[in-house]
């Protein structure tokens, strides 16, 4: 029983990574296949021009105003909410973007006197807030069926999206392809076992059929280092 449970947990973990990969596709306005290929680009399907901002944060003394750029990002998302409310904006960023941001003079100066600069001496990668926007470094990655490794967020970019909206994102599930699951409400994960001939072992099968989707891709914004 213990060995069986370990195998099931390993299979569950693989499904969780796949779901994370698909959800990051939704954050980019894409419906992805398991191998990372694009099935549908929602910007193309709905005739929406993707929005991106160039942040010149890697060049020292560039004069780039991070606070002004944050307010510009907030105003763009607020405008495209079209009357809906949000509780905040979150940005998943890659390591190069994060390093450039936390080393920028505007950010350093803002946190220098807060708790005697404790934040600057701490590991901020799990998230810090600047001008009403929370920035979090994301290091997640997945292995494709062919063996290649894909990062969910590229090192020099970020992906911004609103929090607390009613219907921006959803994850739909389809039932497993078993006789007993036809015309039933889908579950997030299915697991079955079947004994081998002459009781010489047990075969395990797990299945998940998720479809993470962004209903309003115009609220998704890409940030890039200029």
Please place each PLM-identified region on the residue numbering.
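Sequence/fold signature of self-assembling virion shell proteins
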Residues: 108-226
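Secondary-structure junction/capping motif
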Residues: 11, 37-41, 65, 137, ...
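Extended, solvent-exposed, turn-rich assembly/linker loops in the middle of proteins
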Residues: 39-115
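Long, contiguous amphipathic alpha-helices that act as assembly "spine/axial" helices in icosahedral shell
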Residues: 1-47, 77-99, 200-206
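Charge-rich, low-complexity amphipathic helices
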Residues: 26, 33-40, 103, 114, ...
């Amino acid at each position: 029983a213990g060995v069986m449970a370990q195998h099931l947990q390993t299979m569950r973990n693989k499904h969780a990574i796949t779901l994370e990969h698909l959800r990051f596709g939704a954050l980019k306005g894409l419906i992805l296949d398991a191998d990372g290929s694009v099935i549908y680009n929602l910007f193309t399907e709905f005739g929406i021009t993707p929005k991106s901002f160039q942040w010149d944060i890697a060049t020292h003394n560039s004069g780039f105003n991070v606070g002004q750029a944050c307010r510009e990002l907030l105003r763009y998302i607020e405008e495209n909410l079209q009357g809906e409310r949000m509780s905040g904006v979150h940005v998943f960023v890659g390591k190069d973007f994060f390093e450039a941001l936390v080393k920028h003079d505007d950010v350093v100066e803002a946190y220098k006197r807060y708790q005697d600069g404790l934040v600057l001496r701490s590991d901020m990668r799990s998230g810090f807030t600047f001008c009403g926007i929370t920035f979090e470094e994301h290091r997640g990655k997945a292995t494709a069926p062919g063996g290649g490794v894909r990062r969910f967020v590229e090192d020099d970019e970020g992906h911004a999206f609103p929090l607390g909206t009613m219907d921006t994102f959803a994850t739909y599930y389809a039932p497993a392809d078993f006789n007993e699951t036809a015309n039933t409400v889908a579950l997030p994960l299915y697991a079955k076992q079947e004994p081998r001939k002459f009781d010489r072992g047990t075969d395990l099968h797990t299945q998940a059929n998720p479809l993470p989707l962004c209903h309003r891709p115009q609220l998704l914004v890409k940030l890039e280092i200029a």
